[in-house]
Design a protein with these regions (language model features):
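Broad hydrophobic/π-residue packing in well-ordered secondary structure
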Residues: 46-51, 84, 91, 109-110, ...
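Short, surface-exposed, polar/charged, turn-prone segments marking secondary-structure boundaries
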Residues: 32-35, 56-60, 88-89, 111-114, ...
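Class I SAM-dependent methyltransferase SAM-binding "motif I" and its flanking Rossmann-like core
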Residues: 95-96, 102-159
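Conserved PLP-enzyme active-site core in the AAT-like
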Residues: 84-85, 89-97, 126
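N-terminal beta1-alpha1 cap of cysteine-dependent amidohydrolase-like domains
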Residues: 1-82, 86
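Gly/Ser/Thr-rich beta-alpha loop segments that engage phosphate groups in nucleotides
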Residues: 10, 35, 89-90, 121-125
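Glycine/Thr-rich phosphate-binding loops of Rossmann-like dinucleotide-binding domains
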Residues: 14, 39, 93-94, 128
């Protein structure tokens, strides 16, 4: 069974990975920014600052690649030491994960590997049964919350 590191937002993910008690060497990270309105910024931050400074390879799985090249996407994920799902619009994130078939892949990775699954905010919600999300604010409904169905790998409501 795998390891999940779910962050509410902020913090240094590498510190959490090292302190998880399940730490092993991380050489390859896959960044998933499906929820973000600016995934290139998040990817570059992970690549250049958070992990790149330690010589860790960071690869970017885009929504286009996930939706159009499932076999390539699966290979990329299975070859990772850590998968990081960034925050943003949780509804958009879950829609893309399900449409691309990655929901099944993530569940299998969790059950059959020691790959660390991680995420912040929307990226943390995705691993849980449900999440309390502000995704409606992306459509002009400021302050409104929505209960979003995650992958259910962890049977909790993430707020």
């Amino acid at each position: 069974m795998g390891t999940i590191i779910a962050l509410g937002g902020g913090g240094d993910l590498l510190d959490y990975v090292r302190g998880s008690g399940e730490f092993r060497e991380v050489h390859k990270v896959v960044y998933i920014g499906f929820a973000s309105c600016n995934p290139e910024f998040g990817y570059n931050d992970m690549k250049n600052d958070l992990f790149g400074r330690f010589g860790i390879d960071v690869l970017h799985l885009t929504p286009q690649n996930a939706l159009n090249s499932r076999e390539l996407s699966e290979r990329l994920l299975w070859d990772a030491d850590l998968i990081y799902v960034d925050g943003g619009n949780t509804i958009q994130l879950m829609k893309t994960i399900r449409e691309s078939g990655l929901d099944r892949v993530f569940a299998e990775i969790y059950e059959k590997s020691d790959i660390i699954l991680s995420g912040a905010s929307a990226g943390a919600i995705c691993w849980c049964r449900y999440g309390n999300s502000d995704s409606l604010s992306f459509k002009g409904n400021e302050g409104k919350r929505a209960r979003v169905s995650g992958l259910g790998i962890i049977d909790v409501l993430f707020c």
